[in-house]
Structure formats: C-alpha cells, structure tokens
C-alpha cells in the first residue's frame, strides 16, 4: 500500500507535492479542515484516511495544537538548565495556558530559555523584554572555533566557491566518486555509515529519475551544528548536494528543513536564489551537460523524520512512519526512485574533500574515523558553542580546554542526543571524539552534541524525561517502540511521583524488547542511555527498584 501511495504522490512531482499542500491548508486555522483534507485526497487519488493520518501527526498541523500561539522548548538542554518554568510563567502574562504548546529543541542549547513565536525563535534574555506587539529576538551569539578548519572555514564568495564546482564538472563521475572513497568519510548524522557506499549504490541504479535529499531535520536535543551550517555555511551544503547529484545522476536536490529552524529556511532559499542568479542551476550547468535544481521542504514538527525512510514518507505526504528495509532508499526511495539521504554536516564536508583530495582528508582523524567533527556544547560550559575538532581529539580537551570546564557541578553528560550514551564525569578522560572510542566504551558519538546533567538533577527524573520524549516522538508503526516507550514512561513516572518500586526484571525485559524488536533506531536506541544510567548511577537509582 505504501508503495502505491508513493507512486500516486509522485504523479505531480516535487513542485506540487501533497505534504506542502497539507501544511498550507493548516495555516489559517492551525489545522486543515476536513473539507480541505478530503479535497486533497481526491486531488491526489488517495484515501481520505491518508491525508487525515498525515495531518494528525505533526505538531504544526494536528488538531490538538490548532489554538497554540506560542511554543516552549522542552528539549533536554533546556530542561536540565531549569529555566523553562520561569519562561512559562512569564509567557502566561501574555497568553492563556491553552495557547502555550511545546516543541523539542529550537537549537538554542547554548543559552536555553528558548521559545518559538510567530515563525521566530527566542532564547536567553529575550523573555525579559518580550512583547507580543513588537517582539525582537536577539541575534544568536555563541562561540565558533576550530582546531582544524574545514567546515568552519570562511566562505569566499559565490565565484570563488563554485569555481571548484566548475572544475569538478569537467571530471568524470567515477573520478569524483573515487575521491569520496579515498576520504573514507562516514555519515555525521549518527550512524556513521560510509558515504561513498551509499552514493555508489545509487549511481549503479538504472533509472532516469533520482534524488539527493539533505536531511536537515536535526532534532536531537542539544545539537545545533546543522543549524549553524544552514545559517552560516549554506553554500557548503548546496555544493555537496550538487556533487552528489553529478556522481549519482540525480537532477533534484531536496532540503528537508525542520520547522523549528524557521530562520534557516529563508537563508538557504536565499543561497539557492544566488545560485540561480549566477546561472549555476537548471539545465546544462556551465556547459557540462549536468542538470540540477533544488527544492526546500519545510517540515511540520516531528522528530522521527530524522530517520531517512520516515523523512521520505513525509515528503510524499504520507504519515511519517519508518519503512522496512530492504529495499533501501538508494534503490527505492522518494516516489520509489533511487535516493541518497545524507545529513547536513556530511554534505558540507564534501567541499574540502573535492578541494584538497580524498587522501588529504583521510590523513585527518583516526584509522576508522576520518576528518573533522562539529561538537556542540550546552550552556553548562563556560564557553558554550560549536567547536570543529579533528576526529580522535580527547574528550577531556573538548570539555576542559575548548569548553572551559563547567559553570556549576555536573555529574554526567549525554552525548549524541536522546539516544546517545550517558557518560559519567569520571569517564571523560577515557574517551575521544570518534565512533570507535564511544562504541568500545558502551556509548554513542551520534551528532556529538553534549548536554550536561547537573549534580542536583534526579537521574530517575532524567530517565522519565527520555522515555516521555521517546514515547511522544514514536511514529507508532512497530509495537515494541509504540508500546514500550509508553510503558517506560509510565514506570519511571510512577517511580518518581507515587513511591512506586519498579520490578527490575520487568524493566530489563522492557529494555531488551525495545532494543531487539524495534523497527528503527528510535525504539532500538533508547535503551542505551537507560542502561548507562543503571550501570553508572546504580547507587542513586537502586531505591526506585525492587
């Protein structure tokens, strides 16, 4: 059924897609009317249940949020900072309680106190002078430093930047793919999958229509590196997508940008317009015979769309449920066509690889983790911000030298988002910023976002927060995740609020079921931080179990 829906959705192509039409139908009243959804179902020759199922999933289109006027961030960094209750109290002076909703991570983890109003994000001291009639968000201000400058290198202007593209287009796709292979770059979105393998698989598919998708739905609380690249280095991302298109034979690049990053949408669109003005988009670019264009899809608020197949379903206007694999997207992706899905930071790294060569890139980092990595530090650090470091850099250097240590006592850090490991402070000296170091020690590097858990923050409260997040954001397709995350939240909530003792054997069975039975890394990944907490903070947690 899903395959048929993909075909039906693809009949009108990217420029007239169902997902955007559902979003447009929600603008006036906060949610699409029944009549609008039925009309779209008829237009795209799909069932009415399909359009309703899609609209009822997203934060910005679902019925229960239609009266929301302002959204408070409930991401992990903001929760740990302990400022959101004060922000909510101040917002209640301007809005009724039923007009205040929540969103998970606005990318303001470096100063917290974040909220979203009327298409803009606010944080820090913004709440102190917030006025509905004339809101003025301050310009984001955080540290951006590099020990090895690649991703954070200054932008040299359109002409200089894209002279490299013109040179690259004179080479064969095999030559360029070989440079990607030699670089040994692995995906920066969390999984660490070899990028060249994905590109080659798509290249080898025989199909006249292919797509490159930039997964800019960075939803991991604590991570704002993709936001930085989209707002400050958009042409690095666009360049990477164009090279991917040339190598694989794709003519469309789709940027799926999360709704929680509204400013980024406008900045990336401006960058695309600059390319068009300079005749670097469309047919036969620079006389090379290469055709390529971009389409921005603005997401509507769903963390699960960071999973590549849920993202593809979302673009098609389907409910963003995870697909079973195989077939993989490189064979059957968007509209059932061969598709490459890469993370923002992964695509941005392509510029350096093409400019300096794959061998030069591979000299950076460790044996299996090459290149550089952006690391995000939250507001508990004396120097919060984004730091570009070479893979293999000691975590202690990131924390103590670059980050300047902690402002207040911290007992652990969650690194790599809500599905990343919980690293106790005493383990910092044993880790380095690379995939293998974290995996060998029972953690996950993921996006390399670092959220601090203060000493006075209950670890059981933290586990409740993780389960609440996982349950709310589950796509609901597989039973282990849909039911297991909900059950985990119920157990931890009761333990925190009702003097309830959790059966440890039952809890362990729940974690094993989630890990082994879930269809994707959402349900399968949430047991990792829970198990880390049980291992390293047993003394604090043991009284909650029998």
Regions found by a protein language model. Name each.
Residues 1-546:
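Feature of Fe-S/electron-transfer and energy-metabolism proteins
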């Amino acid at each position: 059924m899903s395959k048929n829906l993909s075909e039906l959705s693809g009949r009108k192509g990217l420029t007239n897609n169902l997902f955007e039409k559902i979003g447009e139908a929600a603008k006036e009243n906060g949610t699409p009317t029944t009549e609008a959804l039925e009309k779209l179902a008829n237009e795209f020759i799909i069932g009415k249940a399909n359009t309703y199922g899609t609209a009822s999933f997203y934060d910005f289109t679902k019925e229960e949020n239609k009266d929301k006027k302002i959204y408070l961030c409930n991401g992990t960094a903001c929760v740990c900072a302990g400022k959101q209750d004060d922000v909510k109290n101040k917002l209640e002076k301007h809005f009724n309680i039923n007009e205040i909703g929540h969103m998970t991570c606005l990318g303001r983890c470096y100063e917290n106190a974040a909220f979203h109003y009327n298409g803009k994000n606010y944080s820090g001291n913004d709440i102190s002078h917030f006025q509905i009639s004339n809101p003025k968000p301050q310009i984001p201000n955080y540290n951006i430093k590099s020990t090895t400058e690649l991703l954070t290198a200054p932008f040299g202007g359109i002409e200089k930047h894209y002279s490299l593209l013109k040179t690259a287009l004179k080479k064969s796709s095999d030559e360029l793919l070989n440079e990607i292979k030699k670089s040994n770059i692995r995906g920066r979105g969390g999984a660490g999958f070899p990028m060249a393998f994905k590109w080659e698989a798509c290249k080898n598919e025989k199909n006249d229509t292919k797509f490159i998708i930039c997964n800019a739905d960075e939803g991991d609380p604590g991570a704002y590196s993709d936001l930085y690249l989209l707002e400050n280095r958009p042409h690095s991302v666009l360049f990477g997508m164009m090279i991917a298109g040339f190598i694989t034979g794709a003519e469309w690049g789709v940027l799926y940008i999360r709704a929680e990053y509204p400013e980024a949408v406008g900045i990336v669109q401006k960058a695309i317009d600059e390319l068009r003005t300079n005749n670097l988009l469309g047919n036969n670019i620079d006389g090379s015979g290469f055709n390529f264009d971009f389409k921005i899809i603005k997401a509507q608020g769903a963390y699960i769309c960071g999973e590549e197949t849920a993202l593809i379903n979302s673009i098609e206007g389907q409910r963003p449920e995870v697909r079973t694999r195989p077939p993989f997207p490189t064979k059957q992706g968007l509209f059932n066509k061969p598709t490459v899905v890469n993370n923002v930071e992964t695509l941005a790294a392509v510029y350096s690889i093409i400019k300096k060569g794959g061998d030069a890139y591979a000299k950076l980092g460790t044996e299996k983790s090459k290149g550089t990595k952006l690391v995000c530090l939250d507001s508990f650090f004396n120097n919060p911000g984004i730091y570009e470091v070479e893979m293999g850099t000691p975590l202690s250097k990131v924390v103590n030298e670059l980050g300047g240590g902690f402002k207040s006592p911290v007992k652990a850090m969650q690194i790599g988002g809500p599905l990343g490991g919980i690293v106790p402070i005493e383990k910092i000296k044993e880790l380095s910023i690379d995939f293998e170091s974290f995996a060998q020690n029972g953690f996950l590097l993921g996006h390399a976002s670092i959220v601090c858990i203060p000493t006075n923050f209950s670890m059981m409260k933290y586990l409740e927060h993780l389960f609440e997040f996982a349950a709310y954001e589950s796509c609901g397709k597989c039973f282990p995740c849909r039911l297991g995350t909900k059950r985990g939240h119920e157990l931890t909530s009761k333990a925190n609020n009702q003097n309830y003792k959790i059966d440890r054997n039952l809890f362990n069975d729940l974690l094993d079921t989630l890990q082994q039975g879930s269809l994707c890394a959402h349900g399968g990944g949430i047991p990792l931080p829970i198990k880390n907490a049980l291992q390293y903070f047993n003394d604090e947690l043991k009284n909650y179990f029998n």
